[in-house]
């Protein structure tokens, strides 16, 4: 089990990403459009983007297992780590999933 503080930190990061998502996208759009905006406007937008909190970047968020909080080997489709996914599948608690046999 991951520490509660680590799980809470990830939740806080997710909230921060959602809070600044529109502003980040707006600034990135200004930076991308070379023909529309002047160099000064683009430089100002880049500076504003750099001043946003680091945790506002989506790449800082790490997927964690919903049950254990484990950060590695988490399946996106289920939101579970490989260990918990196997346990729940073997007990038949994950609908539509069963052990392969051929």
UniProtKB/Swiss-Prot annotation:
Functional description taken from the UniProt entry: Binds 16S rRNA, required for the assembly of 30S particles and may also be responsible for determining the conformation of the 16S rRNA at the A site.
Cellular component GO terms held in the UniProt record: cytoplasm; small ribosomal subunit
Pfam families linked to this entry: Ribosomal_S14
Any one GO molecular-function label of the UniProt entry: rRNA binding
PANTHER family named among the record's database cross-references: 30S RIBOSOMAL PROTEIN S14, SMALL RIBOSOMAL SUBUNIT PROTEIN US14M
Keyword field contains Hydrolase: no
A GO BP entry: translation
Keyword Repeat in annotation: no
Subunit record text: Part of the 30S ribosomal subunit. Contacts proteins S3 and S10.
Protein name: Small ribosomal subunit protein uS14
Family, per entry: Belongs to the universal ribosomal protein uS14 family.
InterPro entries in UniProt: Ribosomal_uS14, Ribosomal_uS14_bac/plastid, Ribosomal_uS14_CS
